[in-house]
């Protein structure tokens, strides 16, 4: 049996409103729906998945710090912090855990202020515009990278 992978999923501000906030942009699934499906998918592949959603930047940073030497890979949807947070960038660089940046909407097809990410250039990859499936694609990619598949 392969060794269990420990994966952390982080979701930033306002993602707790998924399913009610702008469903034409973000889809109709709630964050709980997305995380439950992802957790089930992860368990089938011997991946232990933990999750945090926070509207507070410092809580996301603390969770990243706590992940040092405990977590193998991070999937992060930084939401609005994508475009503003040097602190999240520095935290991710500081722990040196590989990560994939995920966005439900295509940020490049939206307002110009959403086109810049403080994380993309240090991420293993970026998935945007594919809705909730983007999390599943990120999970599969993380597993592939860690297991050299």
Curated annotation (Swiss-Prot):
Catalysed reactions, as listed in the record: 3-dehydroquinate = 3-dehydroshikimate + H2O
GO BP terms: amino acid biosynthetic process; aromatic amino acid family biosynthetic process; chorismate biosynthetic process; quinate catabolic process
Pathway: Metabolic intermediate biosynthesis; chorismate biosynthesis; chorismate from D-erythrose 4-phosphate and phosphoenolpyruvate: step 3/7
Molecular function in Gene Ontology: 3-dehydroquinate dehydratase activity
Chain positions recorded as substrate binding sites: 77, 83, 90, 104-105, 114
Site (Transition state stabilizer): 21
EC number: 4.2.1.10
Record keywords: Amino-acid biosynthesis, Aromatic amino acid biosynthesis, Lyase
Keyword Amino-acid biosynthesis carried by entry: yes
Record Pfam families: DHquinase_II
Xref: InterPro entries: DHquinase_II, DHquinase_II_CS, DHquinase_II_sf
Keyword Transport tagged: no
Assembly, per entry: Homododecamer.
Biological role stated in the UniProt entry: Catalyzes a trans-dehydration via an enolate intermediate.
Protein family: Belongs to the type-II 3-dehydroquinase family.
Protein name as catalogued: 3-dehydroquinate dehydratase
Native species: Psychromonas ingrahamii (strain DSM 17664 / CCUG 51855 / 37)
């Amino acid at each position: 049996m392969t060794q269990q992978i420990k994966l952390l999923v982080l979701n930033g501000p306002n993602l707790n409103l998924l399913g009610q906030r702008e469903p034409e942009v973000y889809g109709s699934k709630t964050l709980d729906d997305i995380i439950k499906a992802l957790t089930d998918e992860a368990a089938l592949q011997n991946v232990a998945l933990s999750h945090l959603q926070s509207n507070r930047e410092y809580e996301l940073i603390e969770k990243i710090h706590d992940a040092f030497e405990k977590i193998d890979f991070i999937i992060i949807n930084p939401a609005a912090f994508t475009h503003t947070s040097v602190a999240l960038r520095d935290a991710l660089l500081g722990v040196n855990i590989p990560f994939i940046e995920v966005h439900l909407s295509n940020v490049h097809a939206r307002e110009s202020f959403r086109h810049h990410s403080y994380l993309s250039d240090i991420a293993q990859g970026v998935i945007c515009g594919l809705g909730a499936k983007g999390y599943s694609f990120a999970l599969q990619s993380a597993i592939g990278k860690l297991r050299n598949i």
